[in-house]
């Protein structure tokens, strides 16, 4: 492949976008939304000690959300739109190969998406100045956002080469993005709830009379707090169904927001709680990896439990430490899927073409 020819294709695509007034309007609306989000985040986290990481994570998540909503429109008609406008065929008869055309349009779509990150840069800088933001978290989160923009751009360009109608390819690109961002959550919840297991729990506690006083083993009526004299009830058994999210947690690994949160380094406060949105998302997703207890036992007559101890609660920090990251697997799946679609688009766009969809314009 010739880099100069690929850049020429990308530059032509970018020049067409720069000439459109709607492009600048879209960037302006994007900036206004981020301004409002940043202001609200400052109000929400400003009263917290060390609220900078929380503000930064909110702005980054909203930036990724907005780019995911905009990118399908910018890349979903790159090839079939040119075919409808009769501008693809003149390019195909030049020295530019099909692969160079595809890569050039992909690079242009990626750069276009990065323009929105550039608009978000001042707001991200403000959030970094406001609080003590972890520089490692800043660097990793921005890299993941840039890569996710590239993945969505590649999917949109590929679908525009696979499908003949621009409107249809844009719609399918939106569906793919929705499947990754929302469909994975829905599938995780529904399948995890459907794939359930039976749990049998046992519990017992001290017995109390009608006045609310504990019953005493020696027949007395004043044994409050004397555990060796308080009467303990019989064991009670109950059976119920427990969702098995630990069997389907991998479905979330390809979610763009889960990848972003899981890859970003997390810092914790003294109680083991994350100091940003990334950490809370990571802890929530990682907790799904832990199998549920199918035979729980609660002994209210145990002195440790009676005194308020015996809890098996895990802090988010402990949950993250006991589980494994999955962001690199999800990102690899996304990249492989985008690469497969690009190969399919190359096969559909290459010339000479043996067959074309009915009604396809070639010149």
Give each language-model segment a name.
Residues 55-86:
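Long, hydrophobic alpha-helical segments
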Residues 15, 19, 99-116, 120, ...:
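Alpha-helical transmembrane segments of multi-pass membrane proteins
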Residues 59-66, 75, 142-147, 329-336:
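Hydrophobic alpha-helical transmembrane segments of multi-pass membrane proteins
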Residues 68-75, 155, 341, 345:
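Hydrophobic/aromatic residues in alpha-helical transmembrane segments
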Residues 74-115, 349:
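Helix-loop-helix units of permease transmembrane domains in multi-pass membrane transporters
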Residues 1-11, 15-22, 28, 34-36, ...:
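Transmembrane alpha-helical segments and their membrane-interface loop/helix boundaries
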Residues 38-39, 44, 57, 63, ...:
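Secretory targeting signals
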């Amino acid at each position: 492949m010739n880099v100069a020819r690929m850049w020429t294709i990308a530059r032509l695509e970018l020049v067409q976008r720069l000439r459109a007034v709607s492009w600048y309007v879209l960037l302006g609306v994007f900036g206004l939304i981020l301004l409002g989000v940043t202001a609200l985040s400052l109000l929400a986290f400003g009263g917290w000690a060390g609220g900078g990481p929380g503000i930064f994570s909110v702005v980054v998540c909203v930036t990724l959300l907005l780019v995911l909503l905009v990118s399908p429109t910018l890349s979903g008609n790159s090839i079939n739109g040119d075919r409808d406008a009769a501008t693809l065929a003149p390019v195909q008869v030049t020295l530019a190969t099909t692969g160079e055309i595809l890569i050039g349009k992909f690079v242009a779509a990626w750069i276009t998406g990065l323009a929105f990150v550039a608009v978000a840069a001042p707001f991200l800088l403000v959030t970094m100045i406001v609080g003590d933001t972890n520089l490692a978290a800043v660097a990793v989160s921005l890299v993941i956002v840039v890569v996710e923009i590239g993945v969505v751009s590649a999917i949109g360009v590929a679908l525009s080469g696979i499908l003949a109608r621009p409107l249809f390819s844009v719609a399918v690109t939106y569906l793919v993005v929705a499947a990754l961002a929302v469909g994975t959550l829905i599938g995780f919840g529904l399948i995890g709830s459907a794939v359930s297991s039976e749990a049998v729990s046992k519990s017992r506690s001290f017995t109390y009379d009608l006045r609310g006083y504990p019953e005493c083993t020696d027949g007395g009526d004043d044994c409050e707090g004397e555990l060796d004299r308080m009467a303990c009830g019989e064991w009670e058994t109950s059976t119920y169904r427990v969702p098995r999210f630990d069997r389907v947690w991998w479905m979330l690994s390809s979610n763009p927001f889960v990848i972003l949160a899981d890859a970003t380094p997390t810092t914790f406060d003294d109680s083991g709680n994350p100091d940003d949105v990334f950490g809370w998302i990571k802890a929530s997703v990682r907790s799904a990896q832990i199998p549920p207890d199918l035979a729980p036992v609660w002994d209210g007559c145990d002195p440790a439990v009676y005194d308020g101890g015996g809890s098996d609660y895990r802090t988010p920090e402990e949950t993250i430490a006991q589980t494994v990251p999955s962001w690199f697997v999800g990102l690899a799946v996304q990249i492989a899927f985008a690469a497969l679609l690009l190969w399919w688009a190359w096969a559909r766009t290459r010339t000479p073409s043996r067959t074309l969809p009915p009604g396809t314009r070639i010149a």
